[in-house]
């Protein structure tokens, strides 16, 4: 057996090294390897959205006006989902649907799949950017881990949910009022507010807002060293070595207020990371469940009693009737291709009516 000792030498002008040196060079805007995914995808996603909201109608897919050109404003313009008949087609510009015709591609809803897919990969690229920069400056990757939560929500709502339904048609369109319509749809057809995963998501987001407000106020309240500047932002150097607020004072204050308090800054900040990230991940899992048409809580005994006794009604039974109303009124407008017609007598009315 021969053992070779020595060092493997590469060519001085190795292409990978040249690329690595240029991509990771210290500049005003870091590019990095992740930038090869992030910047093109973000550019195309934003460009597609601005193009769609400015010029493209939704007449052929939803029977709606959805662009500034047709009279919409920022709140009502949208890039709409493709028609239900197109199912889960990727709607490639060169595909069998548009056959290279850009105008026809826009009319069919091709911009929605374009924006959704480039947007998803752009978000993933941004998370990889945080990983790459953290590794470069020897930080731990918790920023990237935290950013995985909004990515999970985006992917579950815009991609996984419609994949579980009959087509991209049932995903949210990219617009403010369009998202509101989608929320009403989720409530009416899935009773989303009574879903335990939605409850965990709300607890995570609102709990994080509360923690953030308490934390910021506590740090401001316990500042003990004043600088010469006119305000907090001018008073201190951002690279100062010493703390200028008192963790001990904050601990004593909240111990008196609540009876318990964080005594360790690592645990405090981990908790502030854990609450919103876990909440968003739970809500994303809930949306995956809705893609499979899993149901929320059902209190059937209350529904049966409400049906038998005109004087018995709970907030739950009222909400169930409201959901039926949303479905009956919304389906005919939201799915015009189904030609749904509901006579007046089948539209739900509560016991009070």
Curated annotation (Swiss-Prot):
Q: Which SUPFAM superfamilies match?
A: Bacterial photosystem II reaction centre, L and M subunits
Localization, UniProt: Plastid, Chloroplast thylakoid membrane
Reactions this protein catalyses: 2 a plastoquinone + 4 hnu + 2 H2O = 2 a plastoquinol + O2
Sorted alphabetically, which Gene3D superfamilies does this protein's record hold? Photosystem II protein D1-like
Q: Which GO terms describe its cellular component?
A: chloroplast thylakoid membrane; photosystem II
Q: Which family does this protein fall into?
A: Belongs to the reaction center PufL/M/PsbA/D family.
User: What is this protein's record name?
Assistant: Photosystem II D2 protein
Which species? Illicium oligandrum (Star anise)
Tell me the name of the encoding gene: psbD
